[in-house]
Structure formats: C-alpha cells, structure tokens
C-alpha cells in the first residue's frame, strides 16, 4: 500500500511539474545557419519542446561567441553552440554547462576565391570569420595551421558575420576565404570557389574524451 501511495504521489508530482513548466517560456540561442543547427527549429516546429511542457522562442544571434555573451548575461536560457566559445567563456570565469553533443568533428570546409589555386597562395590573404572566439574563428585558424600558414603572422582574420555574409564578402572580393558548413560549400562549388584541399582532408576530431 505504501509503495502504491508513493507511486501515486510521484505521478501527481510529475503531472504538477509538467503543468507548471508548461507555463514557462525558454529562450534558445541559435548561432549559425547549417544543417545541424536546424535541430532547434525542427524541435519547435514538430512540437518536441511542447511535448515536455516548454514554450520555446528560438532567437538567431550570429556567432557562437556572441551567443555566449548573451547566455552569460541571462538573456538566453540555453543555446546551441560548438565547443570553443563556451570553453573560452568558462576559462574566463563563466559557469556554462554542455549537456549534449551533436558533433565530435570539425566539419567546416575551406572556401576561397576562384583564383586561389594552391595552398601556397593562402599566405598573406584575408579570411573572414563570424566573431573572434567563435567556432568559425577556431576552425579558420586550425585549418590554416594544418596547411602550414601562421594565422597570426601570415594571414589576416576579419570579423565579417554569419556564413551568408562571409560568402557575400568572397563574391565582392572583400575577403579571400572563409570556412563554412553545408550547404554553403555546395553553393561555393557552383560559384567556382574551390574547396582546397578536398573536404575529407579537413575533417578531424575535437579533443574530447568521447572522440
């Protein structure tokens, strides 16, 4: 009998908790336009958040580092981010928690202006990222180092904005290259902006215990 009453009490508690949480609105940050970043919108449109009693507002804020700033300020309840911005913020005293991981690889592609035909031509060029400290910034610098280009001494890194803005900056010759997720790599191929080297050579694991 006691076990039955405990079970009933637990079910009542869960029901009340769900009703209470249904009245709560959460603000979710979204930092990029990419295939994996669409999960927040899918969750909202398919009613997955509502299923668990959450009313969700998805807010697009370009750049992971900018998302972190808004998150730390308390104006977001959670955000979909890559690893670099949150880790950097925690090293500076923030108390952010990552509770799920979508990717264990850096899946950016390097997109350059069509006239760049070799890795050697990357030296001395201008490259665009979303914001300093973002995953795009981390990925851009990591890729340059991977091919022997010092991102500090042999390249210029500029804050441009989100991926559509960076592709536009390549078209207008304001920058020479950038990193981008799908589907922007496919778009760049149609525009005759090369991916150098082939995308598969750029895919490497983040340094995490699960990788």
Regions found by a protein language model. Give the residues of each.
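Intrinsically disordered/low-complexity terminal segments and short unstructured peptides
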Residues: 3-4, 19, 55
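Short, glycine-/small- and polar/acidic-enriched structural segments
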Residues: 24-152, 156-162, 166-172, 176-187, ...
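Extracellular/periplasmic periplasmic-binding protein-like sensory domains
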Residues: 205-211
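Sec-dependent signal peptide recognition
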Residues: 2-10
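Sec/Tat signal peptide C-region and signal peptidase I cleavage site
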Residues: 16-22
């Amino acid at each position: 009998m006691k076990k039955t009453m405990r079970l009933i009490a637990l079910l009542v508690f869960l029901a009340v908790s769900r009703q209470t949480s249904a009245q709560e609105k959460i603000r979710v940050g979204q930092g990029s336009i990419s295939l994996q970043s669409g999960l927040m919108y899918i969750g909202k449109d398919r009613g997955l958040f509502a299923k668990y009693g959450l009313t969700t507002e998805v807010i697009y804020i370009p750049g992971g580092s900018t998302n972190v700033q808004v998150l730390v300020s308390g104006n977001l309840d959670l955000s979909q981010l890559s690893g670099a911005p949150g880790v950097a913020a925690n090293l500076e005293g923030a108390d952010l928690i990552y509770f799920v991981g979508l990717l264990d690889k850096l899946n950016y592609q390097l997109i350059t202006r069509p006239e760049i035909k070799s890795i050697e031509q990357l030296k001395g060029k201008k490259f665009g990222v979303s914001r300093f400290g973002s995953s795009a910034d981390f990925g851009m610098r990591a890729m340059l180092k991977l091919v022997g280009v010092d991102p500090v001494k042999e390249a210029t890194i500029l804050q441009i904005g989100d991926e559509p803005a960076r592709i536009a900056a390549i078209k207008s010759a304001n920058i020479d290259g950038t990193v981008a997720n799908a589907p922007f790599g496919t778009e760049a191929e149609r525009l005759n902006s090369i991916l150098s080297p082939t995308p598969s050579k750029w895919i490497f694991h983040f340094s995490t215990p699960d990788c």
